[in-house]
């Protein structure tokens, strides 16, 4: 199967090449979801990886320490927030629709609940976290024994996503539920993924104009 995928692999997203002080580097636009047939990058991306001595990721999600830290935001002093009953019921409805384990989901921070149902909903568009470019890049670097580094830390990501005023967080969940209930969430996901896959930089740069995720002051913070 891997050989078939590798033979049919095409370059997707955007790959920049830069040079400084006689050294060459590459910048690649990765994404957190993917399709099985996209799992292996195309020849130009593979060549860039092979020519690189180090692979620097947003966050190395195959690192066991990172995985442990991401699984427990409380270790960073981030407190969980209970959803008001109306929002909780709406979340449960969405969770059942995307086949999420309702009881387990309810124990997560509300933002993680929203992220989880969004990722699970993407499966209906044949998109999976397990086929994301970050997982391939990290696995490739490990297999090739290249240096791996992260630009961010688990704590930074957790604080960026989850820390904040409870009112703002609940407003974010409200906006997310509205997108799901209107049927627009999947449309937006597919539009973003297609823009990434085709390397449509103009569409990606206009993301905030069409994502319907910047409608409130909280969204724009």
Report the location of each language-model feature.
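Structured, acidic catalytic/metal-binding patches in enzyme active sites
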Residues: 1-220
